[in-house]
Amino acid sequence: KTCASLTDTTTQLTALGFHLATLPVEPRIGKLIIYGALFLCVDPALTIAASMASKSPFLSPFDNREAANESRKAFSIDDSDHLTIVTAFKKWRELRIRKGDGAASRFARENFLSRIALFQIEELRKQFSSLLVEIGFLPAGFRLERAGETSDSNKNAKNISLLKAVLCA
């Protein structure tokens, strides 16, 4: 009921509950990726969902905690941990695509980001997008790698207020 998956008067599934029941993920993650698809902010929704299902990409080494915190603040958006992760992941991913793994590894090291966590997020994003295709929330043939911010599925990817609403729904 906390995910609005049951009706108030009966134990029948709502439309959302029906779709959540088909996904092999926690309901809160399923709800986030479905709403991300519905509200055309797939890319950030997938990143947030993937980060919720894995470890945080931010490292906080005991001997360099202050520098790590400063680095994290550089990625910060609207005091939101989730949106901060979206920004850090997006920069790492763009650098990896443009300049390769070596540059992305340096970026991760310099910014106190866990490469393992970033790769896990990347893999989970692919899995979650495939699930959305399977249940019809993304078109057949959807390719996450080609779905930039200008694609139909990401028309609202930069709308911070909408992203926060999707997170809180």
Residue map of PLM features:
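Second RecA-like catalytic domain
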Residues: 1-169
